[in-house]
Design a protein with these regions (language model features):
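Extended, low-polarity transmembrane helix blocks
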Residues: 1-30, 71-150
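Short hydrophobic/aromatic-rich motifs at helix boundaries and adjacent loops
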Residues: 7-11, 37-40, 63
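Solvent-exposed, well-ordered loop and adjacent helix/strand elements within mature globular domains
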Residues: 24-58
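Short, surface-exposed linear patches
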Residues: 43, 52, 62, 91-93, ...
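Hydrophobic alpha-helical transmembrane segments
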Residues: 53-77
């Protein structure tokens, strides 16, 4: 019982992050063209073939990370991959925010959830949200490392 109580914060953080990645990936499944349009809306210079590849693979990467987070499998590697994906998303949304691009981040389909959450789809809102999620990954890493030392 004591071991479960000690692990509860890590479990909660894994589930929260897992749900975020599940929602993001699920909303993009079968939406390759809208995802591709979102990638182009960031106005970054990448080859068309790479943009198309990202649009096709990204939902599956997000879903895989969700499953790994839920299951707690390959934990340090899953956290590193999650941090890398979030860092890339943060860099993209931050540059769009800095350049004052009036775009939807393409992270989720907030319209299906509630219009009040639309602010989280703006580049500024998405950047702040991603920084919060990155801090949760950092906290999860710290909890994992601390538990391994103890």
């Amino acid at each position: 019982m004591k071991d479960t109580a000690a692990r509860l914060p890590s479990i909660v953080l894994r589930v929260v992050l897992g749900w975020v990645f599940l929602a993001a990936g699920w909303s993009k499944i079968g939406q390759t063209m809208p995802t591709l349009a979102t990638i182009y809306s960031y106005q970054i210079v990448i080859p068309d073939l790479l943009a198309e590849f990202i649009a096709m693979v990204l939902p599956w990467v997000e879903l895989l990370l969700a499953v790994l987070l839920f299951a707690g499998l390959f934990f340090p590697w899953t956290l590193l991959a999650t941090a890398a994906v979030l860092a890339a998303f943060t860099a993209l949304t931050a540059q769009a925010w800095w350049r004052e691009l009036d775009i939807d981040c393409g992270c989720f389909d907030f319209g299906a959830i509630h219009a009040a959450l639309a602010v989280l789809s703006t580049p500024g809102g998405a950047t702040v949200r991603n920084l919060v999620l990155l801090s949760l990954v950092g906290l999860l890493w710290w909890l994992w490392a601390r538990r391994r030392v103890l």
